[in-house]
A protein has these predicted regions:
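Cytosolic-facing regulatory segments adjacent to core modules
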Residues: 57, 88-173, 187
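Conserved nucleotide-binding/hydrolysis micro-motifs of P-loop NTPases
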Residues: 75, 104-107, 154-157, 182-185, ...
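Accessory, often N-terminal, substrate/partner-engagement and coupling regions
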Residues: 1-21
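Short, contiguous acidic/charged loop-to-helix segments that flank catalytic cores in large enzymes
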Residues: 73, 153, 185-202, 228
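Substrate-engagement module of ASCE P-loop NTPases
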Residues: 88-91, 198-220
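The Walker A/P-loop phosphate-binding site
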Residues: 15-120
Length: 228
């Protein structure tokens, strides 16, 4: 099954997954009047802005509890887009972000961010071939104090992910999560009856549940086949 079809099937089937106990408190006036919270928000968007104005005008910012899937073929710029957006959120809006990189190391991501922010040559940055002025410029980069938390745990399971999100939310009140990328996650348990497509669908369902539990948007990068 093509990855595109799998994602569409997941989105259609979210409601059909096992129901959770009803924990709604109907005595809460704000739950009956959700617009009151938005009315108190004086910013242009009631979600987390991406920093890309054309996109934010459509989405009104990434909304709490949303699961956003960004899918594209290999080498189309998914990570570059996610990093650019992360930079905007953490520096321009000072909102804490948790970035889970299952492919690249935290060091590689930091180098890419520094190169993009400073305009320095990426290769020179990696090799340490910098002038004293360039080193001083890096030391004063706004990225050094940005509320960005990178986790590069490989083959991350859903259980591990939830535990890390809970810790980040409690300690740093993160406002958004990025996962790079979906196909490198796992459920943490082996089921011979479940094929790869079913496992991906189950992971997505679990991620949606986590987004709702912690009331924050989760952005998932997903690779699709070049044949799609």
């Amino acid at each position: 099954m093509k990855q595109r079809e799998l994602i569409v099937r997941f989105l259609r089937s979210l409601i059909s997954y096992g129901a959770c106990p009803d924990k709604s408190d109907y005595s809460d006036k704000t739950s009956r009047n959700p617009y009151e919270k938005n009315a108190r928000n004086k910013s242009a968007f009631n979600g987390v802005p991406s920093g890309f104005m054309a996109l934010d005008r459509v989405t009104m910012g990434w909304q709490p509890s949303d699961l956003i899937i960004i899918a594209a073929r290999p080498s189309m710029g998914k990570t570059a887009f996610a990093l650019s957006m992360t930079r905007n959120i953490t520096i321009d809006y000072n909102k804490p972000v948790g970035y889970f990189s299952l492919e690249m190391s935290a060091q590689q991501l930091k180098m890419r961010l520094l190169a993009a922010e400073s305009g320095l040559n990426f290769r020179n940055l990696c090799n340490g071939q910098l002038t004293p002025d360039q080193r001083k410029h890096l030391e004063t980069s706004p990225l050094t104090n940005a509320p960005l938390f990178i986790d590069d745990t490989p083959a991350l399971s859903i259980t591990e992910f939830r535990s890390k999100v809970e810790k980040l939310k409690t300690q740093h009140d993160i406002q958004l999560i990025v996962i790079d990328y979906l196909q490198l996650m796992n459920l943490g348990c082996h089921d011979n009856k479940r094929n790869h497509e079913q496992e991906i669908a189950a992971i997505l369902c679990s991620l949606k549940a986590i987004a709702k539990e912690f009331d924050l948007p989760i952005i998932v990068l997903s690779m699709v086949s070049r044949s799609c």
